[in-house]
């Protein structure tokens, strides 16, 4: 096992990784920007190093500074967390060049799955169903219009290198496509350095179901069942749960086996997630693969009893999985909500100083958090400030705990999405599990 791990991240995920490393006796190295000089992760780690200015490009996205810091601290591995550099193949390659273990898959797999077009091609080759569409980069606007008319409107215009909803837009007709195409192409080029676009058919009234995978370096791959992430705003998840209320045992087995087959086909290692879109008839289609730990990994941990960060560390250190598929059992129901520092109606970020902060303290409620009273939420980074996870023996029990905990959650000084979460959890549709990716638009 590793002696010292540098965490190339911030916020709650840095705290989460530090917690597992500490339990395993692994020393931790935190990195921080000027804006984060007093952040909790800098105090929780064994060592902490300033890596740059507040701007993310000058700190958490600065590959060479992070590598230099890892060497200075004599870290033998780097955990990228999620977001930031976690799916940057160049970062993984630089770690490899410096003989620092990157806790994740190989650089070539990150690159392949990072290109949504290449990922579609790989899944098609593996016999995994993909959303009807094209697996080639679109050329000019005329080519895009021809392709869309062949598929049939409405279509989803997507950036090949995209993520977090950036460069993605639903278009209803040719006129809308012409308006959207160049803007999204430019946005993708600006954000990701790749303006390649492709088109997929819109699956109406769909659910977003993803499968958590673990794969060691010795050919063993298992799935840890599914998560339902259908409650979204602007193509970003807000509420996630495991298991899905929509997935029956037959679909669970089928979608899990398909995800394992897909991971094996590309030679995947470490923790990963395959996201599927599922229609009303339970047909499922590959959307994308996330080659990192997911924000919503705690709901899987709660129902399986496994520490996914520990498994990542063990796999990266060359250990074999100590369990097989049949050993993994589901227990209970878990729901996660993301607490964002944002206006609950407009979704605009709400930076500022937290003047009061208290977390609900009840059995079956878990908090992943990196803010406190007097913490400053800056405009430089993602507005998610915390996650709350509830677990019950049944979904009904979990929802009851969720509603109670949300009412007891207190954040003052900034706006948050807590009112939205309270409303969502109280709806008849959510309680009945009648949730699609249109849920927030339809019910709130």
Curated annotation (Swiss-Prot):
Keyword Metal-binding recorded: yes
Binding positions for Mg(2+) 1 per the UniProt entry: 275, 288
Gene name in the database record: accC2
Protein name, entry field: Biotin carboxylase 2
Domain of life: Bacteria
Phylogenetic lineage: Bacteria, Bacillati, Bacillota, Bacilli, Bacillales
UniProt-listed SMART domains: Biotin_carb_C
Amino-acid positions noted as binding Mg(2+) 2 in the UniProt annotation, renumbered to this chain: 288, 290
Cofactor requirement: Mg(2+); Mn(2+)
Catalysed reactions, semicolon-separated: N(6)-biotinyl-L-lysyl-[protein] + hydrogencarbonate + ATP = N(6)-carboxybiotinyl-L-lysyl-[protein] + ADP + phosphate + H(+)
Annotated ranges, domain Biotin carboxylation: 1-444
Residues bound to Mn(2+) 1: 275, 288
Binding site for Mn(2+) 2: 288, 290
């Amino acid at each position: 096992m590793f002696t010292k791990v540098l965490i190339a991240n911030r916020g709650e995920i840095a705290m989460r990784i530090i917690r597992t490393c500490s339990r395993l006796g692994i020393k931790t190295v935190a990195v921080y920007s000027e804006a984060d000089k007093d952040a909790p992760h800098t105090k929780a780690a064994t060592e902490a190093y300033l890596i740059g200015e507040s701007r993310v490009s000058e700190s958490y996205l600065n590959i060479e500074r992070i590598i230099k810091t890892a060497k200075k601290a004599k870290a033998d591995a780097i955990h990228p967390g999620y977001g930031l550099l976690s799916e940057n193949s160049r970062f993984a390659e630089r770690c490899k060049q410096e003989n620092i273990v990157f806790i994740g898959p190989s650089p070539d797999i990150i690159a392949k799955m990072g290109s949504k077009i290449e990922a579609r091609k790989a899944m098609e080759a593996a016999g995994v169903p993909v959303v009807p569409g094209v697996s080639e980069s679109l050329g000019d606007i005329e080519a895009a219009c021809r392709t869309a008319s062949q598929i049939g409107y409405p279509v989803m215009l997507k950036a090949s290198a995209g993520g977090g909803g950036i460069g993605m837009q639903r278009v209803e007709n040719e006129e809308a496509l012409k308006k959207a195409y160049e803007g999204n192409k430019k946005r993708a080029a600006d954000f990701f350095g790749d303006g390649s676009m492709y088109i997929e058919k819109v699956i109406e009234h769909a659910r977003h179901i993803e499968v958590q995978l673990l794969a060691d370096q010795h050919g063993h791959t298992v799935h840890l069942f599914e998560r339902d992430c259908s409650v979204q705003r602007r193509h970003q998840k807000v509420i996630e749960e495991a298991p899905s209320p929509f997935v029956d045992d037959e679909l669970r087995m089928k979608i899990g086996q398909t995800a394992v087959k897909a991971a094996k086909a590309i030679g995947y290692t470490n923790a990963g997630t395959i996201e599927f879109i599922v229609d009303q008839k339970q047909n499922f289609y590959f959307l994308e693969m996330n080659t990192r730990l997911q924000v919503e990994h705690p709901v899987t941990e709660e129902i399986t009893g496994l520490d996914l960060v520990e498994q990542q560390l063990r796999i990266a250190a060359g250990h074999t999985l100590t369990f097989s598929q049949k050993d993994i059992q589901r227990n209970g129901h878990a729901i996660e909500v993301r607490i964002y520092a944002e206006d609950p109606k407009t979704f605009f970020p709400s930076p500022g100083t937290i003047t009061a902060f208290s977390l609900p303290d009840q059995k079956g409620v878990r908090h992943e958090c990196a803010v406190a009273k007097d913490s400053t939420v800056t405009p430089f980074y993602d507005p998610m400030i915390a996650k709350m996870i509830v677990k019950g023996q049944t979904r009904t029990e979990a929802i009851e705990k969720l509603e109670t905990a949300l009412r007891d959650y207190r954040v003052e000084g900034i706006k948050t999405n807590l009112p939205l979460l309270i409303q969502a959890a109280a709806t008849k549709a959510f309680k009945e599990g009648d949730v699609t990716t249109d849920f927030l638009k339809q019910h709130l």
